[in-house]
Amino acid sequence: MKVARVSEIKLLDREAAEKYGVKEEILMENAGASVARLAVSLIGLPMSAAVVCGPGNNGGDGLVAARHLSSMGADVKVFLVAAPDKLAGIVKENYERVVKAGIAVEVVDEERAEGLSEELSLFDVVVDALFGTGLSRPLEGVYRKVVEAINGSGSLVISVDIPSGVHGDTGQVLGVAVRADYTVTFGLPKLGNLMYPGAELGGELYVHHISYPRALLEDSRLKVETNDPVPLPPRRPDTHKGDYGKALFVAGSRRYMGAPLLCSKSFLKAGGGYSRLATIKSIVPFLGVRAPEVVYEALEETASGTVAYGNLERILELSKSSDIVAVGPGLGLEEETLRLVCDLARSVEKPLIVDGDGLTAVARCGEYISERRAPTVLTPHAGEMSRLTGKSVEEVRASRVDAALELAGKLKAYVVLKGAHTVIATPDGRAYINLSGNPGMATAGSGDVLVGAIAALYGLGLGFEEAVRMGVFVHGLAGDIAAEERGQDGLTSVTLMNYLPKALRALREDFESVLERYTIKVLP
C-alpha cells in the first residue's frame, strides 16, 4: 500500500477535485461517515459519543461523524474547540448542519477544558477531531488541555486521520498528543501514522479511501509504501546447496565471537545453501563447535585480535566464488581492519551487505560505495546512521524516512534503517516501511541475524531489492512468531535465528494469511 506525505495527500485532494470532480465536500462527507461506522461497529447501539472538534478540516470531519452517529441512533455531543463565528467554508456548513439536526454543541475555552476529562469519561467513545495531519507546531493553551482531557477520560478514543498532536510526516509528538485506541486515516496512510511514536499513539490503524479514484491511490509519484511480502521462489526437487546461494561473511574478532556465528548460521536457517565464514584463526575452533554446518576460512589477525589488512587478496579471491558478500559484523574498530573494509567495498565485485563495524569504515570512505557497480545494502541502526550522515541521533529518529532516502541517494546504495518499523530506502528515491517485528527483537545480535536473512533471500533467487525487503520482513516475522510462542521478554538473537525456518514455512504454506496480517485494514 502506498504511503503519503502531507504535501502529497493535499495534492491528491486537489487532483481529485480538478481532474475527477470529487470535491472536498464529498471527501469530508465520506471521511466523517467512515469514522461513525467504525465507532458503531466497535461498540454497537445504543451508544454515547463525544466528538471533539477543532477549527479546521479535521474538525469538519468530526462534525460529519457527529451527524452520522446521531442519525444512526447514538447519543451525541459535540465539543467545539473553536469560536463558531470563526469557522469557514465547508467546516462552517457542517457545523450548521449539526446545529439544525439538534445535536448538542458546547464551545470549549481554556477554562472549560479544565474539567472536561470528567465529562468525557461519561461517554462510550470519544472522537478526536481536534487537529489532523496539517499540524506543524506544538499544541499549547486550550488545545493542550483538551488533549490531556481526552487522554485522561478513560473512554475508548478514535482519532480522525491521525492522533491530534502527532506530526503528519514524522510521527513525532508536537508538545502533547492524543493516545488513541483506533485511528481512521483517509485516502492513504501518512508517514506519521506509521512512524513511531505516532504509530503507537494511533492504536489500531484503519484506512478509508473516501472515494479517491484508484489512479490517485496508486500514483507513481508516491515514492513510499509499506513493505508487503512477496511469494518465495520454490525449492525444486532436483537442486543442491549451490542453487540456494553461496554467501561469504567477513566477520568477527577476538572480542566479538557471537556476531560471525549469528550471521553465517542465520543464512542457513533462512534457507541459504552454502555459508562460508572468513574470520580470525584464533576463534575458528570455538565457532566450529557451535556451527559445524558453516565452512570456515581462517584469517591472519592483528595484535588486538581483529582481521588483519594482509588478508585483502585472499578475501577478494574467496568473493569470486560467492554469490553475495557480507562485511562488518563484530569486526571491531582496529584502524587497519577499517581500512580493509574500505578496500573490500571498493574491490568486491559481488552484491555486498555492510553492517556493524563495517559501517564505521564506510562513514570514512563512502565514495567507494557510490562507485560500486554491484548493488550494496547498508544496515545501520540510528547510532550508526548518525555516523554515516553527520546528523545527530535525535535528527535521524525525528525523520527516519528522509534520513534513509538521503543516504541511499548519496551513496547509490540500499539503506536499511533499523528500528521500530524499519525503513528500507532505494538508490532511486523510493522507500518501504516494514510492519513486521516487535520490541522483543531489541537485543544484541538481532542485526547479525538480519544480515544472514538478507543474504539467504538473495540466495533463494530473489532479485537484490526484493531480497533486502524480504530479508527485513522475514526477520520481523520470525520475531513475531517467536514472541507469540515465547513472549517478548528474554527473546535472544539465537532464539530469533531459530525461528527463521518457521517464518519461511508460514510464507510458503499460508502466504495469504501472512499478507493479510501485515496489511493495513481498509474500511468498506
UniProtKB/Swiss-Prot annotation:
It catalyses: (6S)-NADHX + ADP = AMP + phosphate + NADH + H(+); (6S)-NADPHX + ADP = AMP + phosphate + NADPH + H(+); (6R)-NADHX = (6S)-NADHX; (6R)-NADPHX = (6S)-NADPHX. Residues 224-507 form the YjeF C-terminal domain. (6S)-NADPHX 2 binds at residues 330, 448. Its cofactor is K(+). PROSITE patterns: YJEF_C_3, YJEF_N. One of its GO terms (molecular function) is ATP binding. Its EC number is 4.2.1.136, 5.1.99.6. Residues 224-524 are annotated as: ADP-dependent (S)-NAD(P)H-hydrate dehydratase. Transmembrane segments: none annotated. The keyword Plastid does not apply. Binds 1 potassium ion per subunit. One of its GO terms (biological process) is nicotinamide nucleotide metabolic process. Residues 9-218 form the YjeF N-terminal domain. ADP binds at residues 418-422, 438-447. K(+) binds at residues 58, 128, 164. Bifunctional enzyme that catalyzes the epimerization of the S- and R-forms of NAD(P)HX and the dehydration of the S-form of NAD(P)HX at the expense of ADP, which is converted to AMP. This allows the repair of both epimers of NAD(P)HX, a damaged form of NAD(P)H that is a result of enzymatic or heat-dependent hydration. In the N-terminal section; belongs to the NnrE/AIBP family. This is Bifunctional NAD(P)H-hydrate repair enzyme Nnr.
